[in-house]
């Protein structure tokens, strides 16, 4: 998961100018995964960030295009859901804040994540799709 540790004059971690950096990081990650995972492994993820094209473009199309509602339990810890409220400079996004605040009146205590505008999405694809996408062979 990317944190806001790469924000500068070129923008935040998902800025167009930084696609190469992010893909290099992911290439190194999947080179490591390929050494220990079985060839028929499936890569799965879950995040609200799969709503964002700038994030999806970092992954193989088969993975990014597999988006569907996340059905596992969702906990409000870390930035898995809260991250959508802040920008790359860790400032509050007023539009997102306003949606969350407006939704508090109907808040379901059993599902507080539903107050956020971008719900978590689940994605998955074969490891081979990642190896091919990052030029690591299949």
Ranges and model annotations:
Residues 66-129:
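Accessory, usually C-terminal, subdomains that scaffold auxiliary metal cofactors
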Residues 128-138:
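Long, compositionally biased intrinsically disordered regions
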Residues 1-82:
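Acyl-donor binding region in acyl/amide transferases
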């Amino acid at each position: 998961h990317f944190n806001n540790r790469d924000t500068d004059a070129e923008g935040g971690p998902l800025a167009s100018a930084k696609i190469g950096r992010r893909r290099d990081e992911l290439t190194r990650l999947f080179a490591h995964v390929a050494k220990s995972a079985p060839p028929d492994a499936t890569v799965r993820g879950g995040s609200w960030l799969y709503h964002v094209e700038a994030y999806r473009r970092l992954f193989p199309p088969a993975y990014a295009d597999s988006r569907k509602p996340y059905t596992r339990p969702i906990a409000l810890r870390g930035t898995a859901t809260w991250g959508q409220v802040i920008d790359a400079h860790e400032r509050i996004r007023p539009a997102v804040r306003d949606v969350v605040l407006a939704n508090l009146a109907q808040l379901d205590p059993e599902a507080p994540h539903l107050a956020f505008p971008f719900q978590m999405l689940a994605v998955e694809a074969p490891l081979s799709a990642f190896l091919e996408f990052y030029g690591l062979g299949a």
